[in-house]
Amino acid sequence: MGFSLSNFTGDPFAITTISFGIISWVVALAGAAASEQSTFPHFSWWGVAYQIVIILIIFVLYANNNIELYKFTLVGLVSIAFIYTTNTTNNLIYNSDSSGNLCCAAGCILLSILNLIWILYFGGHPESPTNQFIDSFSIKNHGHEHLGNTNPVSKSEVQAYDEMGANNQDYRRYVSPAQIPDAPQGPLRLGSHQDISSGNGNTTMQPPNMPGSAVHTPQGNTTNNNNTYMSSSHLAGLENFSSQDVPGSGATGRDLTNNSTSNKRNTIYTDSETGTGITFRYKAKALYSYDANPDDINEISFVKDEILEVDDIDGKWWQARRANGQVGICPSNYVKLLDT
């Protein structure tokens, strides 16, 4: 996970608490520096130094987008800082009348409040009401890394598929909103020289090229109307099919025309058929309904109590697959793992 300030700026809770912590620490440091050192508790200097280290650690974890992996460690570290700041406050308020000492005590009071908030948040369960309320402010603004290393499909390219499917019912939309690992790289391009013919002789349409491949006709298969086929390998990573059935044409390819007389089936595929290379090892139940962010093509929508297959369950966003075969990412605090 690379270092990026967008990971930090995308979380309002991180910006608010760390900014508040830096301001409070500066107040405490200024008071300690202005105090008479002969009467100032020397151990309080260690508490002030320890506090800034904790603030910097939390900032780095947020910037690297792996804060979730160290929450329990942070609870212990912040608890120690909480003891230091509260003890320093007690010593400076009741044992000195120096304005510098009182200024340092004021900063330590603010740091104690901050440390208590961090303990409650980092120590709380992701499904707790307080954590879900706090995370709700960053759920839409937090940037996601695209799944895998494929180039993201632009919004205009997806709309081109939608328009083509709306104008010809023989052409189905085979675009997944998520970037699937191991999918061929390269953006989708329109303007293929191959046509998909309809069985009734209607005007053919030119579908977009699949990334890294071309539509072709299997050898030895010739018909009068020059029907074209798409190999099943070209459909790798495109699980997000429409709800309508897809005609099957055997192991060598899938017939995308209306000429096939073979049996139809629902568009739910196994791991080997989809070619994603992902094994969804867990099942999760949706605690709430979630509408995917229209600006992020990787997200999927789901409804409350829906059962999802999930994997890669580290962090705030998990890879998930719905019952209809749609693959993408879902927020971890909206679902609950089921015992299998």
From Swiss-Prot:
It is a multi-pass membrane protein. Residues 1-12, 64-65, 123-340 are cytoplasmic. It is found in: Cell membrane. Residues 194-207, 229-246, 255-271 have a biased composition (Polar residues). Residues 279-340 form the SH3 domain. Residues 192-271 are annotated as: Disordered. One of its GO terms (biological process) is regulation of actin filament polymerization. Plasma membrane osmosensor that activates the high osmolarity glycerol (HOG) MAPK signaling pathway in response to high osmolarity. This is High osmolarity signaling protein SHO1. It comes from Candida tropicalis (strain ATCC MYA-3404 / T1). The gene is SHO1.
